[in-house]
Design a protein with these regions (language model features):
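Conserved GNAT-family N-acetyltransferase fold
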Residues: 245
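Beta-rich carbohydrate-recognition and catalytic domains
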Residues: 1-99, 103-179, 184-240, 248-300, ...
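Acidic/His-leaning functional-site neighborhoods
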Residues: 304
């Protein structure tokens, strides 16, 4: 007789089938290349009307701000500018404003649109008061707009930040800082709330990053779920990363794409996945990464996934990192696909 834990496990055959469905062995080069003095990061792609949009992060040497680009074919992108700026001086998010749309339709063969709640379209964002690249501590904010077309007019929630590493109920794995979120609607409420928020965070010992979860019924008030992370890798006492989760629903299986670093041999940062039937118990893929460093433009890192399927082709955008002659990082957004484009 199977135990309850064994029933939650995803079989090796199913894991292999998911890998074959989502793999993207063909690299198509840079989708958005950085200009001098900037680094680009963390793509989110969705459809509205007849156009595709990409929300991405721009680092200008001071901190993060959130930008937008558009495309008609998912390959050529035109920048539209900044849509979510840093907060006012003296505010908790005065130096960092890394936002991403929430409630994306997760269906693998779905329309890849944004779903509204309470008549609004939502974003989660990480914010911070200190200059620099992801300087601790970072906390979580919420913002909304009245329609996807209002991408330049987002209202910050007055009760921000909604999740902080200093919260009394923060768990050990999130005591240093909180990073990127992916929020999914769960009609079954299998985790205890209508909305489930997966996010990576760092502990205060080795700054090891793992992925945990929180739930909400209104997108504003969040309750942490569980005593620890749902995805973790590597030695708990050594720095490593399991980060930037995003989720799709492939038939009856939830698939979490995320990136790993410093726990899988000597390769640089890479993208992989895990699977679940209930959003709480996850089986990690132990095989070949979905993308990993292999080209001059991603020689250091190929990480931070955004994956979707459209017209039978799987598209996998990621942050590609290399270094120039003086050792400085070059960060842009690259694309890999399931078919040779």
């Amino acid at each position: 007789m199977q135990t309850k834990a064994e029933k939650k496990e995803i079989s090796p055959e199913t894991m292999r089938a998911i890998y074959e469905e989502v793999k993207t062995p063909f690299k198509a080069g840079m989708a958005l290349a950085p200009e001098p003095g900037e680094m680009l990061d963390s793509p989110v792609v969705f459809r509205h009307g007849d156009a595709w949009f990409m929300v991405f992060i721009r680092f200008d040497g001071k901190g993060y701000e959130t930008h937008l680009a558009t495309s008609s074919d998912l390959r050529s992108w035109t920048r539209l500018g900044c849509i979510f700026r840093r907060g006012e001086k003296g505010q908790w998010d005065q130096a960092q404003s890394d936002a991403w749309p929430a409630l994306v339709d997760t269906r693998w063969d779905g329309p890849n649109t944004l779903n509204p709640f309470d008549g609004r379209y939502w974003m989660m964002y990480l914010g911070g008061a200190k200059d620099g690249y992801e300087t601790d501590p970072l906390s979580t904010g919420v913002a909304w707009a009245d329609a996807p077309s209002d991408l330049r007019r987002w209202t910050r929630y007055a009760g921000n930040p909604v999740l902080q590493s200093s919260d009394a109920d923060a768990r050990d794995f999130e005591r240093a800082t909180i990073y990127r979120h992916f929020t999914v609607e769960d009609p079954a409420r299998s985790c205890g709330g209508r909305f489930v928020n997966f996010y990576n965070a760092a502990d205060a010992v080795s700054h090891r990053e793992a992925i945990g979860m929180a739930v909400s019924d209104d997108m504003l008030h969040w309750r942490r779920v569980g005593d620890g992370p749902v995805i973790e890798n590597g030695d708990p006492l050594k720095h490593s990363i399991s980060g930037d989760p995003m989720i799709r629903r492939i038939r009856e299986v939830w698939v979490m794409f995320y990136f790993g670093h410093q726990w899988k041999g000597s390769i640089g940062a890479f993208d992989t996945f895990a699977c679940s039937r209930d959003l709480m118990h996850w089986t990690k893929w132990e095989g070949e990464p979905l993308v990993q460093p292999s080209e001059p433009y991603d020689a250091c890192y190929a990480h931070k996934p955004w994956v979707l399927k459209h017209d039978g082709i799987v598209y996998h955008w990621y942050c590609a990192v290399s270094r120039n002659a003086d050792g400085r990082e070059i960060r842009g957004i690259a694309l890999a696909t399931s078919k040779d484009m």
